[in-house]
């Protein structure tokens, strides 16, 4: 039986809020645009698809123009993060190395093209992951990307690890088990399965896959 763990990225595998905020504000300066981004604003769009971010980041701007600005931000962000990557969570590489010996690991994110790749390369994590998919690749919702990747890779069972209520809802739509990374950005009431740090993940994953 092929068992896999799918990971969200922001708030689950790294925290890049400060880097994104700095990069996007530099982009607005470069383009002489009146928009600016605070820490809280960037945090509020973590986990949203590109289209979902536009009314928050570029309020009052028509979608086509907002998307062009968003794409400029993302283009600069990719370059910025390659030199100044997000912050990994404690014990992350140790945990991923352990999990990768037993399960196949993937990243499923609502990010745009290039963002997941940036995490994998700049943090040297490619060796632990079998693949990834993002909203920018497919233009699909996260639950659809979960099912797409599951079918594409011939996976029998999936556990999704994410930090937000949206992640939990998307996992439910895809009919896969969800683990709340409560150290991340989101708050979930009545979360059935959660971890407060990554060191707790291997034991909980083993328990859920073995039906204990």
Q: Which residue stretches match the model-derived regions?
A:
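Short beta->alpha linker loops
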Residues: 19, 49, 87-91, 111-112, ...
């Amino acid at each position: 039986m092929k068992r896999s763990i799918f990971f969200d990225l922001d708030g689950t595998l790294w925290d890049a809020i400060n880097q994104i905020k700095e990069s996007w504000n530099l982009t607005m300066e470069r383009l002489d645009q009146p928009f600016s981004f605070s820490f809280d604003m960037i945090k509020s769009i973590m986990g949203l698809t590109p289209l979902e971010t536009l009314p928050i980041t570029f309020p009052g701007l028509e979608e086509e123009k907002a998307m062009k600005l968003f794409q400029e931000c993302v283009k600069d962000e990719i370059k910025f993060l390659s030199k100044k990557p997000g912050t990994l969570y404690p014990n992350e590489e140790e945990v991923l190395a352990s999990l990768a010996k037993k399960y196949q690991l993937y990243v499923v994110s609502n990010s745009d093209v290039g963002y997941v790749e940036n995490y994998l390369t700049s943090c040297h994590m490619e060796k632990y992951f079998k693949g990834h998919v993002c909203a920018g690749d497919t233009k699909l919702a996260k639950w659809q990307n979960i099912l797409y990747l599951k079918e594409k890779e011939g996976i029998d069972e999936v556990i999704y690890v994410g930090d937000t209520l949206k992640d939990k809802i998307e996992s439910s739509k895809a009919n896969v088990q969800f683990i709340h990374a409560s150290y991340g950005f989101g708050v979930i009431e009545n979360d059935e399965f959660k971890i407060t740090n990554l060191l707790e993940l291997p034991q909980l994953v083993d328990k859920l896959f073995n039906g204990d």
